[in-house]
Amino acid sequence: MYCRMEFNFFMNDVVQMARKEMVESGYDQLTTPEEVDEVLKEKGTVLVMVNSVCGCAGGIARPAAAYMKNYDKKPDRFVTVFAGQDKEATARAREYFKGYAPSSPSFALLKDGEIQMMVERHEIEGHEPIQVVQKLEKAFDQYCS
């Protein structure tokens, strides 16, 4: 029982640090299905980062997400949902990612509520952050003003 409590405290710290990293990078955290709908139904472009506690999220996806806030062309909104934590919000966001299997970490670029492109876990895990950045830059160039 003691080990389980220690593990839970450790995981809570990991989750809080992962959340904090995204918020400090300038992403709005969506924690409810209602918040997801409110943002994703808006006109304009939105980058959704599906956050997670796995190593490729911390070592690749979150650094790429932070970097993209400084790119010349940007979506209107940068938001994040947290897979495995805010389960209902994440499930609702994934309803907008038509044609893509659930994957975390991942990035989805939407325009006027419609999915335009996705960077899935298999395109993140085992890759360098710059490779993820390049995919996102290409999408921003194509879909963002």
Curated annotation (Swiss-Prot):
Top-rank lineage group of the source organism: Bacteria
InterPro entries: BrxB/BrxA
A Pfam family matched in the record: Disulph_isomer
GO BP, sorted A to Z: cell redox homeostasis
Parts of the chain that traverse the membrane: none
Family: Belongs to the bacilliredoxin family.
NCBIfam families linked to this entry: YphP_YqiW
Name recorded for this polypeptide: Bacilliredoxin BH2759
Organism: Halalkalibacterium halodurans (strain ATCC BAA-125 / DSM 18197 / FERM 7344 / JCM 9153 / C-125)
